[in-house]
A protein has these predicted regions:
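GST-like domain detector, emphasizing the conserved glutathione-binding G-site
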Residues: 1-173, 299-311
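A short, terminal or domain-edge coil/loop segment
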Residues: 105-115, 161-170, 184, 188, ...
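GST-like fold's C-terminal all-alpha helical module
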Residues: 125-261
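C-terminal or late-domain output modules
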Residues: 1-33, 38-49, 58-67, 197-311
Length: 311
């Protein structure tokens, strides 16, 4: 099968061409910090699939390897993860997971309940703000902004210039450039970023309360069977942990607290999230925790989260 340079319009699902000469049946181009990469890594672990991991730095984790010529040959959209099966690329994480589920049926729980909660925990649409009432994933994406600021502040302006010029999504590139230039001041009182974060948190409270109620007398979202929905919420809850928000929910929602405890004790949590951590992620989360106490507008933002009771 001949190699072919993919076109942007083709980049959904499995393609018929190859983009690599790897001897490995499965290859995953991923990033340690990316939520979508974490989801696919966990799926591969739960399916017990041997794969070759190829780490690609994105600007949050100190570099722009996703904008390199070599990676753009793999994915012109410059996004991770990309899963290769026999060197044929599968684009978009939800399509990669669907492909795994179709290739290895009945290994993870499947039901209407799984579909509902998996979608509820996903980032849906091109504009996260428009979906915050329906999708917890959209809320968590917007609440990750303070962590982005913490992780990006040591990235050189030269790299940011390169990032802005080359990144195919100018909206994302502009937002991240603002994080680097303005720092936590993007969360000043009544600023657009502050208002969006507060709205996202208000809607996330409703999603978390609903999940807590659903988990009554259940081990996993679909009862006794671990599923893709649990993988989705594993990554979301851990991201809330990274942004110093998860305890607001687990201190008051007992079912959610016990559920997160079970998720953290699963082998795939340790092997696919914790063991794939890095100094950049560690220092970013550590600095954010410290900055919440030291930076007045950031402290005010987090105080507003904590002062609003759960529904």
């Amino acid at each position: 099968m001949k190699k072919k340079n993919p076109k942007n319009k083709d980049l959904i699902g499995k393609q018929k061409y190859t983009v690599s000469d790897s001897n490995s049946e499965w290859v995953l181009y991923h990033n340690n910090f990316s939520l979508c990469s974490r989801k696919v890594r966990i799926c591969l672990e739960e399916y017990k699939i041997d794969y070759l991991p190829v780490h690609i730095h994105i600007i949050e984790t100190k570099d722009c390897e996703n904008l390199s010529k070599d990676f753009l040959k793999i994915n012109p959209k410059a996004t991770v993860p990309v899963l290769l099966h026999n060197n044929q690329p599968i684009y978009e994480s939800h399509e990669q997971i669907r492909y795994l589920m179709e290739t290895f049926p009945n290994k993870l729980g499947e039901s209407e309940t799984v579909d509902y909660w998996n979608t509820k925990g996903s980032l849906v649409g091109d504009d996260p703000v428009s979906g915050i009432k329906d999708y917890a994933g959209n809320c968590v994406s917007l609440l990750t902004q303070p962590l982005f600021v913490s992780m990006l502040r040591k990235i050189s302006f030269f790299k940011f210039f390169n990032y802005f010029i080359k990144h195919p999504s100018k909206f994302r590139a502009l937002n991240f450039t603002l994080y680097r230039l303005l720092g936590y001041s993007v969360f000043n009182k009544n600023s657009p970023h502050q208002r969006v974060a507060i709205k996202a948190f208000e809607n996330l409270k409703s999603h978390m309360t609903s999940l807590d109620g659903h988990l009554e007398n259940k081990i996993w979202i679909d009862g006794d069977k671990f599923s893709i929905a649990d993988i989705t919420w594993m990554t979301l809850l851990h991201r809330l942990d990274e942004v110093n928000l998860v305890e607001i929910f687990t201190e008051k929602l007992n079912n959610l607290r016990d559920y997160y405890f079970r998720l953290k004790n699963r082998e795939s949590f340790s092997s696919c999230i914790i063991e794939f951590s890095s100094e950049t992620i560690y220092s970013g989360t550590k600095n954010l925790r410290e900055d919440i106490q030291k930076v007045s507008n950031l402290r005010q933002l987090y105080n507003s989260f904590e002062s609003n009771p759960l529904p």
